[in-house]
From Swiss-Prot:
S1-like domain location: 1-72
Cross-referenced SMART domains: S1
Name recorded for this polypeptide: Translation initiation factor IF-1
GO cellular component terms given for this protein: cytosol
Subcellular location: Cytoplasm
Species, as recorded: Wigglesworthia glossinidia brevipalpis
InterPro entries in alphabetical order: NA-bd_OB-fold (IPR012340), RNA-binding_domain_S1_IF1 (IPR006196), S1_domain (IPR003029), TIF_IF1 (IPR004368)
Keyword Transmembrane among UniProt keywords: no
């Protein structure tokens, strides 16, 4: 079974929610619920409101995603 292609988009963190969840507004003005990837959590990378992030979305559910990179 091959791995499906994930969609990567840029966005801005709007709000911080419990359990390392975030509301992120994407470039196309959609708001998604995103959590931190495991490597970011392991390396204690902090994400604050207003940060520019890269979000990975699966084609199956475009309302949830994973934050994989925080821009400087």
């Amino acid at each position: 079974m091959t791995k499906e292609e994930n969609i990567e988009m840029q966005g801005i963190v709007l709000d911080t929610l419990p359990n390392t969840m975030f509301k992120v507004e994407l470039e196309n003005k959609h708001v998604v619920l995103a959590h931190i990837s495991g490597k970011m959590r392991k390396n204690y990378i902090r994400i604050l409101t207003g940060d520019k992030v890269t979000v990975e979305l699966t084609p199956y559910d475009l309302s949830k995603g994973r934050i994989i990179f925080r821009s400087r």
